[in-house]
Amino acid sequence: MRVLFHPDFPKEVRKFESDYALVSQGLAARFRSEIDEAIKSITLSPNSAGHFLNLGSAVVRELRRRNLRAFPFFILYGVTGDRLIIGAVIASRSD
């Protein structure tokens, strides 16, 4: 399976990582490690690594989300044919 990243994905990760670095370098490193772990999990098993995107009134089966374990973020991705597309890292809440 071919893995593609949205062009903004690395910038988004670096932005959130630098925000955590303002608090603690260790926290930033843990955030980055968890992002890398989630991407590895998605790549190894894209159909079971995350769950369908639920928009409240509709479930979008073409898109999946993989929640990070220790941080309030998820990775949005999709599988189409032989391609895995990693789209975005998104904050789960805004506080």
Language model segments and positions:
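Basic, Lys/Arg-enriched alpha-helical interface segments
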Residues: 1-65, 80-83
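Enriched for short, Lys/Arg-rich terminal
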Residues: 68-95
